[in-house]
Amino acid sequence: MHFFDEDTRQFWGPAGSEEEAYASIEKLDDNAYYIAYASLEKLTSYAHFYNWAKNREMDANLWCAVYTSDEDGYMCDSVPVGMLINPSGSCIDWDRETYPYLCQLDNRADTDSWHISEDTEKMETHFISLLSYLRDHQEIVKILNGDQEIPYDTMIESVKQDGLRIYGFSIVCQKKKLLQLWDEEGISYLYAVPLD
């Protein structure tokens, strides 16, 4: 999470100021892998974000943070929520009517499902199904988040009303990619932790 220091007029994140975050990236090992966390300067539509990532050959193993808001427009107070944008998961059996595209690879015989990431409407359906499934299966949520109350219905309504709005992402990469990302317009903060 970020916070804005009114006195210094700087944003601070997990790695400190922007300058401190950049300095920490410069010190990384060239050959090691890291989990990079990036915040975007502004909310971005899923379609725009996907195309941006694909043009940079980052559309594989990329997790995007989805912004959901309450009826007053404030970000839902909960754990960060998001999704992988590339087809992932295995084809398991579930109620496809209640949770369409719960698994992006809904039907292995359907080669179109390999391109689901390019279809904003299907990705919205996928994300809504993920949230709905978690809402309806609290035993999974308890394992992940204990007894924390998560406003799934509010999040679902937000996506239905405003679509998928991306505010950040995470990717596994090496130092070279981190330095390239640092130079990208549209990224407001970037830091990395070693991949263990």
Q: What is each PLM-predicted segment?
A:
Residues 1-104:
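Extracytoplasmic beta-rich ectodomain segments of secreted or membrane-anchored proteins
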Residues 119-196:
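Extracytoplasmic/luminal low-complexity segments enriched in Pro/Gly and acidic/polar residues
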